[in-house]
Amino acid sequence: NIIRTLSYHTSKLYNIVNYSINKGENKPLYTKLDEQFRNNWHCDFLHSHNRQHCLKLLAQNWKSYFRSLNDYKKNPSKYKGIPKSPKYKYLDSNPNEIIFTNYAIRIKNGNLLLSLSKKMKSMYKVDNLKFELSDKVQSFINMDSIQQVKIKRESVSNRWYLIVVYNKECKENNGDNVMSIDPGLDNLAAITFKDSNKNYLINGKPLKSKNAYYNKEIARLSSIRMKQVGSKKFKNTNRIKSLRIDRRNY
């Protein structure tokens, strides 16, 4: 419930500000947007970090749009059509992600604690949004290096995911050996090494077969569903969503 409430208010804030930019009432500059909309009703339910990153994301989306539009005017052949301005967020399909910075993140007794606004604390009678971290997660993430946490809903499965962004030191490569990978289909990959006579072929036929099964089954179920409701009202069923997830994760 807490996550859905946060998602609702950050999505609504995103849409309100996006509408004002579309109408020419505001320029997509983060500092100006934050100054004007920080007292919006929806902001009462969002921690300052949630609000700020919602507006930063929108400003960045508009910046990318204008960059693409300028490039389109110079190189129209690179595009299938005129770039479109940032779309609105819909709670049932693409709700806005909820972002917490390191200043709103704490680790205590193996739990990830995310700061909430006073309004949310009072509404849900909690001090923070808490997630228990498994030993496995704690083993490969340096908790002191966490920079950001995102809560995002995946469109195919409609599941919510916790995304932890952290700094990690890159190990220096002391060797000069080189590996060459040649992707294929029947042979998924052919691998050779500069300083070795060993070569490897990875069989891709099982993967092709499994992928073909998923595609065929998804097409069959989609055809049945379209006959039931019509193509205009067609939506992925739970079974089709499950198959898409299985195909992606296979």
Identify what each model region corresponds to.
Residues 1-250:
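Nucleic-acid substrate recognition interfaces
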